[in-house]
């Protein structure tokens, strides 16, 4: 971001390229990898998968099976793959606004319509307009794209809000792509991140959860993200949408993700 605006008076403040250094353990490991000089293709080490499964259990009380994890080179890629996996003739994508721009471009990239649901400001906090949601015409199989915690308004949705959204999802027969890349950056001790898919087996069955270490540890340039999809058929559709287009993360991405976590 500083390269883009180095000669102007603009101060770039977006979050993907933070101005904090990555943890010393990560930079040290990157230096060791560079010294070894091997930058070939990578395969996810079992130790990283085990670390993520343990992390989900310990931090979020969310029992994740290692077979549910699918690796991606980035979160924007995951948003687009989710749209392609769900895409059918007439499929509608619903999302809250304002929102990270790829939430709005991903549907059109797959030939889908995007319905924007403006968030409402209540007591100094942005939240979902559930009355507006209920007024929408939807069909079974439509996709709700959730940004949780929300970028850019910063809302960490409460259990009550997520439960209300889950009831709407099940009532309408929707699928959900939940981008939870900021889940580790909850800065208030009184708040706790709740993965949307952890609410119930019924919700997990209809949810694609996207996560990555990139925002938390300033690793966006190493391209290592993952999707958690418990439904075998939904996971098959997701992987089919990736086929021949989406590469695995690089070896260094896998290794630095493990060190960071």
Name these PLM-found stretches:
Residues 85-107:
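Conserved PLP-anchoring active-site segment centered on the Schiff-base-forming lysine
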Residues 115, 120-191:
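Active-site phosphate-binding strand-loop segment of PLP-dependent enzymes
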Residues 109-115:
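A short helix-loop-beta submotif of the ANL/AMP-binding
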Residues 1-74, 81, 260-261:
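N-terminal small-domain helix-loop-helix segment of the aminotransferase-like
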Residues 201-261:
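Conserved core segment of the aminotransferase class I/II
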Residues 110, 171-172, 203:
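Helix C-cap/helix->beta junction micro-motif
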């Amino acid at each position: 971001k500083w390269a883009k605006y180095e000669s102007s008076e603009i101060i770039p403040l977006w979050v993907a390229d933070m101005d904090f250094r990555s943890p010393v353990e990560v930079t040290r490991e990157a230096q060791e990898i560079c010294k070894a000089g091997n930058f070939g293709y990578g395969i996810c080490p079992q130790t990283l998968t085990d670390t993520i499964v343990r992390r989900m259990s310990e931090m979020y009380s969310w029992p994740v099976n290692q077979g549910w994890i699918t690796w991606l080179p980035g979160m924007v890629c995951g948003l687009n793959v989710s749209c392609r996996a769900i895409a059918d003739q007439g499929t509608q994508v619903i999302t809250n606004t304002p929102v990270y721009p790829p939430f709005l471009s991903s549907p059109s990239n797959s030939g889908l319509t995007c319905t924007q649901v403006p968030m409402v400001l209540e007591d100094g906090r942005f939240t979902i307009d559930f009355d507006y949601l209920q007024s929408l015409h939807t069909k079974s199989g439509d996709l709700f794209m959730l940004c949780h915690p929300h970028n850019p308004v910063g809302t960490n949705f409460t259990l009550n809000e997520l439960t209300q959204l889950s009831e709407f999802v099940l009532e309408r027969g929707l699928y959900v792509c939940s981008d939870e890349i900021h889940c580790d950056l909850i800065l208030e001790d009184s708040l706790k991140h709740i993965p949307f898919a952890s609410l119930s087996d019924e919700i997990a069955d209809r949810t694609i959860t996207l996560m990555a270490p990139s925002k938390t540890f300033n690793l966006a340039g190493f391209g290592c993200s993952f999707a958690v999809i418990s439904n075998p058929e939904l996971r098959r559709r997701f992987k089919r949408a990736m086929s021949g287009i989406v590469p695995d993360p690089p070896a260094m991405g896998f290794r630095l993700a493990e060190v960071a976590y």
